[in-house]
Amino acid sequence: MGHSKQIRILLLNEMEKLEKTLFRLEQGFELQFRLGPTLQGKAVTVYTNYPFPGETFNREKFRSLEWENPTEREDDSDKYCKLNLQQAGSFQYYFLQGNEKSGGGYIVVDPILYVGADNHVLPLDCVTLQTFLAKCLGPFDEWESRLRVAKESGYNMIHFTPLQTLGLSRSCYSLANQLELNPDFSRPNKKYTWSDVGQLVEKMKKEWNVLCITDVVYNHTAANSKWIQEHPESAYNLVNSPHLKPAWVLDRALWHLSCDVAEGKYKEKGVPALIENDHQMNCIRKIIWEDIFPKIQLWEFFQVDVYKAVEQFRRLLTQENRKITTKPDPKEHLKIIQDPEYRRLGCTVDMNIALATFIPHDKGPAAIDECCNWFRKRIEELNSEKHQLVNYHQEQAVNCLLGNVFYERMAGHGPKLGPVTRKHPLVTRYFTFPFEEMTVSTEESMIHNPNKACFLMAHNGWVMGDDPLRNFAEPGSEVYLRRELICWGDSVKLRYGNKPEDCPYLWAHMKKYTEITATYFQGVRLDNCHSTPLHVAEYMLDAARKLQPNLYVVAELFTGSEDLDNIFVTRLGISSLIREAMSAYNSHEEGRLVYRYGGEPVGSFVQPCLRPLMPAIAHALFMDITHDNECPIVHRSEYDALPSTTIVSMACCASGSTKGYDELVPHQISVVSEERFYTKWNPGASPSNTGEVNFQSGIIAARCAINKLHQELGAQGFIQVYVDQVDEDIVAVTRHSPSIHQSVVSVSRTAFRNPKTSFYSKEVPQMCIPGKIEEVVLEARTIERNTKPYQKDKNSINGMPNITVEIREHIQLSESKIVKQAGVATKGPNEYIQEIEFENLSPGSVIIFRVSLDPHAQVAVGILRNHLTQFSPHFKSGSLAVENSDPILKIPFAFIASKLTLAELNQVLYRCEAEEQEDGGGCYDIPNWSSLKYAGLQGLMSVLAEIRPKNDLGHPFCDNLRSGDWMIDYVSNRLISRSGTIAEVGKWFQAMFFYLKQIPRYLIPCYFDAILIGAYTTLLDIAWKQMSSFVQNGSTFVKHLSLGSVQMCGVGKCPSLPLLSPSLMDVPYRLNEITKEKEQCCVSLAAGLPHFSSGIFRCWGRDTFIALRGLLLITGRYLEARNIILAFAGTLRHGLIPNLLGEGTYARYNCRDAVWWWLQCIQDYCKMVPNGLDILKCPVSRMYPTDDSVPLSAGTLDQPLFEVIQEVMQRHIQGIQFRERNAGPQIDRNMKDEGFNITAGVDEETGFVYGGNRLNCGTWMDKMGESDRARNRGIPATPRDGSAVEIVGLSKSTVRWLLELSKKRIFPYHEVRVKRHGKVVTISYDEWNKKIQDNFEKLFHVSEDPXDFNEKHPNLVHKRGIYKDSYGASSPWCDYQLRPNFTIAMVVAPELFTAEKAWKALEIAEKKLLGPLGMKTLDPDDMVYCGIYDNALDNDNYNLAKGFNYHQGPEWLWPVGYFLRAKLYFSKLMGPEANAKTVFLVKNILSRHYVHLERSPWKGLPELTNENGQYCPFSCETQAWSIATVLETLYDL
C-alpha cells in the first residue's frame, strides 16, 4: 500500500497564472500535472522546458508532455502527465486549452550538494556558511591558515566576496576586471592563477568537508575598468541614453557648486565648507534655486523653440497647394514630441494636428496672422507645462540632495564626513567625467559630440522603494534627474539591452566571467540581485549550470514583498534567500524569524507521499550577521553574540555568519575601506596576540559546538520546530525528530542591552521540559577575562580579547553550572515533565538539552510505528518489534478486515446520527465545535482530511484528542459492541490504542491519524474488491462514487424491508440479540442522509428504484438488488408500488411513478446481471394479494415475479381508482380531501399512462402546500396530472421489453385483458407499444411550426422545440412548462424521439436548465420560477411560503445524470464532432461533482442546490439517487 516515492500533484486551473507562486521540489520527486475542475473535459496540452533525460537544458525549448490515464476510463479525474525531476534549476511550464495559452508558472528544483572525499550529500538545512572579504585574506599562500579558522569553527561552506581585480575605490564589489584574479593575492616572485584557487577549493571540499561559493556581480563594473573604455556601449552613456543629458547637466552644475563651496566661495551666502546646521542647509537650498537652476535652464531640454515652430507653421499655411500628408485622429490634441537627442529647445509638435486644429477663415494675411498667434499661444502654454514639470523634478532633486548632505555631514548614525572637499564633495557624482575640467557651458558642448559623450557614463546605485522589476536607467525613469539614486560613485551601471545581440561584447564578457566562477566554485551569491535584470541573470545562471549542474544559488532580495521575491526565486531558481537576524529589534522577533524560516510544528501530522504541491516560502540562509550589516556589538552588546547565534542556528534552514562576528570584532568590517588581514589559526596563541586566534578567542569554541549541532539536527531529520518566548530576553527553541521523537531544546538568554549598563533580573522563570533530559549538549556563558581591553590593531582584524566563552559539552544535568536543580513531575499518566530551575543563566548564556520521551512512552511509540509499517514504510525508522504485544496485532489488519461484508462496512465506515440512534448510540460530539457527520471512520476522516494538509494542530478536534481518551475509546468501543468481524476490527483498534494512550498527549493527534488513515484506506480497498470490475478498474471518481453504495445501503437494528419468501435462496439471516431468533437482515437503501435514513422514512419506492441501477447494479451488488426488488414486489397493491414503504404495513400508495421505476429496475437487472432473467421466476411473498386483504406474513402466498409484473400491466389497462386508507390528517396533515383519491390508467387512443388530479401530486415533484398564511395548504405545487412525460417513457420502455421477452417466450404473456362495458377486450403488447410510439412525438413535441395541427393550445406555447412536461393536465398550461423530465424518457425509451428534435430540445435544456451541479426544475423564464428553497420561510407569498417552490426552480442533482446520458446517446446519432464535444461537456460538468464529492464532509452529492449551485441548507447532504445517476453517466462514458 505505502509507496515511498515522493509524488506531488499540481492541479491546473483555467487562466491560473502562478508566476509569483513558488513551488519547490527535490531531485528524485515526481511531479504530476492534473486537470482541475475547470479544465476537465477540455483539450489541454502541458508544455515545459524541463529537458528530456540526458538532454541539456535550453530555456527556450519547450516540449509537450504525454497524458497518462491509469484507469483508461473516460473521465479525467485521474489523468496526469508527469516529470521525473533529476536536475536542479528553475523550469517553466504552461498549458494550452485548444490553442489558447491558459496558465502556467515555474517549478524550482533544489540542487544536491556533495562534499568530502566520499562525495556525501550535504542537505541544504545543514549548511553553516561564513562570509570572508577576499581582500582581507592576504597573499594567496597565507589563505589556508586564515581559512582554517572557519574549518575549526565548524563551518561547512565559505562565501568569498569577489576574487577579481578591484577598482580604484577598493570596494570588494567594484571590479576592474571580471576575468582576472586579484593581483594583490600574488607575491612579487609568484603569480597565482584561477587554477591555484581551484586546487585550494577542491582541497577544502575533499579534505576539510567545506564547500566554497563566491559572488557574481552583474550590474556594474568599476569606473576605471579598462574594457569599459574600449566598449563604452556597455554602459549607459549620453550617446546610447540621450535621455540622461539633462541629469548630466545638473550633475556637473552640482559638482561645480561643490568645488566652490569647498573653496569657501559661498561663505558670504551662509555656506562654509563645514556644514553643521539647518540654517546652512537652507542656504544651500536658496543657492540652488537662485543661482544654479536659472543658469542651467533644464526645462529647455523638454521644450519647443516657439519662434521656429511658428515660422514653420506660417510657411505651411501659406503654401498654395499644401496637402495634409496623413489625416490626424480627431481625438489627438497638440502635444510636445520629445526630441530623442535631448537638444535644448529641440522638441517639436505634429504640424498635421496643428493645421487641423488652427484653420484660418480665409486666405488673407490677417487671418493667417490670427491663426499663428493662436498657435503661438498654445505652444507657449505647452512649454509652460513642461517648465512646471521640470520644476517638480527639481524640487525632488533638492530634497534628495539635502537629505544626502544631512546623512553624510550631520546625522548621528552617518559617516560625518567633515568639510566639503574634492575627495568628499557635497554630493556624490552621478556620471563619470574622464576629461579636464572646464566651465559649465563649455562642458555642455561635449554632450552633443558622440566621440566624447560616449565616455560620460552613469554610475550605479540603488533607489529606495523602487520597483525592482523596472530598470531605473532606462528612458521613462527620471531617477537621475530627480537625484533619487543612492549612488556608488566607483561603479558604472551596465547596459545589457534585451538580448545578447543588443550588446554582444558585454554579454560575452559576463558569460565568460560566470563560467570561470562556475568552473571553480560550487555556488554563487547573486550580488544586488533585486537590481539585476531578470533576463540577464537567467542567461548567466543557465551558463553556470551547464558547468555546475548542482549550482547552489544564494541571493539577497530587498524587494519588500514576498510576491516580488518569488518572481526572482522562481525565474532564477534561487536555492536559498539570505535572511538577516539583525532585522530583529528584540529577542521576540528573533524567535519569530526562526519559526518563520523553516520546519513544521512539533507533533505535525504525517503527510502522504502522494499529495498536492503546496506553495512554499523560499528556503532561507539565516545569517546572524551579513557583511553589509552594522556591527551587533555596537547595536546590541558583546554579550548577545552567543545567544543570538544559538537562536539562529536552531532554525530548521541553512545558517550563516560573517568573519569577525565570532572573534567579537567591535566594528563593522568595511567592504570599501578595510585593508587589514584576518587572523590566522594557532591553537596555542595567547589572547594578547592580535594576529592569531583559537578556541579561547571570542565565541569560537561555542560556535564550533553550535555549528556541529546545527548540522546534526539537519542531517538526522529534526524537522519540527517550536519557539517559546520564556520572558523578554529568554528564547527557548525546540527541534524535534518526528521519527525517533527526540528533541533538542536550546535556552538562550539574549543581551540586546549591555548587561553592564542595563538592568537584568536575577530571577529567571522556571521551565518545564516534557520528557527525560538525556544530557546537556552544551552550556556556554559569555564571560570577561583579565586581559587588556580592545585596541584596534594596525595589521590584523582583531576582536575583543577581554571577552570569551566558558563552555562545557555533553555533560549530565547534575554537572550543570547553569541549572540549579531539576525536579521530575508527571502531568498525566504518560506525561513526564522535568522542571528546570536556573541558577546561572546570566545574559549572554545558553544551555542546550537533549530530551527523549520517557522510556515507557518511547517503547509505546516504537511498537506503534512497528505496526504502522504495514500501511507505510515511512514508519520503519524508530519502529520497535516486541514479542509480547496483543496477539491480534500479529495479524495484518487487511487480513482481519477482509472478512467484512459491504453491509458491515456500512457500519464500520458510515452511519449518520439517526441511524446510530436506532442502534442506541450516536455520533461523536466535539465540545465547542460540532458533532461528526458519521459515527463510523468516515466521520473522523472527513475532519482529518481538512486539518492534515494544513497541519492545523490547534483545531478543536486535536484539542479533544490531546485532552483525553474519549474519542479514542469511542472508535474502538463502538465497534467492539457489535458482533463478528466488526468486533474483531474494534479489538484491533483497541490493541493499537492501548499503546497510543501511553505516548505524550502532544503526539496523539499525529499517531491517531496515522492509525486511522492506514485502517481507512485498507477498508476502502476491501470495499472496492467486493464490487464490480467497472469499479475495481475505475477512476478515483468512480471509486469514490461507488462508496455511496456502502454509505446508503445498510441493515439497522430493525429491518426496513418487508420479509422475503422463506423459499427464496441466499437470503441473509442473523440472530436477533434480544429474542435470540433467526431473522432476515436484508440491506435496505436509504433515500438520503441525514433526513431519510431511519425508521419509516428510510425507504421510498421511487428513490430506491431511481438509485438502484447506479448504487447496486453498476457496483455489482446483485443479490442486494434482487432482494430489494422482490421485497417491494411483495407490497404491490392496487397495481402500484408504495412510495413511503413503512415496512409495507405503513405503506402509502399515493404515487403513480414508483411502479414504473421498479419495472425499469427489473429490466435493468435482467440485462446487467449474469442469468438475470432468473429473477422473473423468483417467489414473491404477497403482503396484499387483494386490494383489501390484511397484511399477510411472508410465505403465506407466494407468486413468481412475472405474475406480479403482469398484474401491474393488467391493473393499469383496467384503470386504477381507490381512496387511500385512513384518508385524513392522520396520514397527511396537509392534503385536501379530494387529494386522497388515487387514479391511474392508460389512454385507449394513445397508449399513454395517465393519472392524478389537481389536488394530489403522484410524481417525484411532489411538494404539497403547507402554509395557511399564504393560503397554499393542501394545494400541490406541481400536480403533474394527466400523462407525465417520464412515466410515458418508463411505461414505453417496459412495454417494449415485455414484448421482446414474450416473443422469446421468456415472459408468458403477450397481451393484457380488460373488461370494458361488460366485454373482455385484449390489447397486445405489440399494439400498446405501437400506440405510444405513434403518438408520443406527435403529442409531446412542441413544434417549431406555429401552425402545427397537433397543437391543442397554441396560445400556451412559450418555447418551441421542446418536449412537454405532461400531456392532458387539468391546467393545460402546465403541459407546456420546460422541465428536465423529458430527458428521463430519452434515456429509457430513446426510440420515441427523432434525433434532430431531441438534440434541439437538449440544447434548450442545457441553456435554460443546466446548473453547476443540478438541473433547474423549472424554466427560469417561467413566472413562478424561484431558485431558492427555504422550507422554514412562512410569509404571504403563495409561490414560496413553506418551500412551495421545492420543484419550481431549485437545481436537483439526479436529473443531471439523465440529461447527460440523453446528451451522450443522441450526440452519437448527430455525428462524431457532436459526440466529441458532448464527451468534453460531460467530463467538464462531472468534474464539479467530483470536486463537491471530495470536499463534502459527508462524502456524497446533495439532493439539490439553490440556483447557480449555491448551498441549500434544507437539502439532504448526500442523496442516493444523486450519486447513482452520476455513476450511471460515468458508466455510459
Curated annotation (Swiss-Prot):
Active site: 527, 530, 628
Enzyme Commission code: 2.4.1.25, 3.2.1.33
Location of the protein in the cell: Cytoplasm
GO molecular function: 4-alpha-glucanotransferase activity; amylo-alpha-1,6-glucosidase activity
GO cellular component: cytoplasm
Major localization listed first in the record, in broad terms: cytoplasm
Keywords from the named record: Cytoplasm, Glycogen biosynthesis, Glycogen storage disease, Glycosidase, Glycosyltransferase, Hydrolase, Multifunctional enzyme, Phosphoprotein, Transferase, Ubl conjugation
GO BP annotations listed: glycogen biosynthetic process; glycogen catabolic process
Keyword Iron found: no
Swiss-Prot/TrEMBL catalytic activity: Transfers a segment of a (1->4)-alpha-D-glucan to a new position in an acceptor, which may be glucose or a (1->4)-alpha-D-glucan; Hydrolysis of (1->6)-alpha-D-glucosidic branch linkages in glycogen phosphorylase limit dextrin
Subunit structure: Monomer. Interacts with NHLRC1/malin.
NCBIfam families in UniProt: glyc_debranch
Protein name, UniProt field: Glycogen debranching enzyme
Species assigned in the record: Canis lupus familiaris (Dog)
Lineage: Eukaryota, Metazoa, Chordata, Craniata, Vertebrata
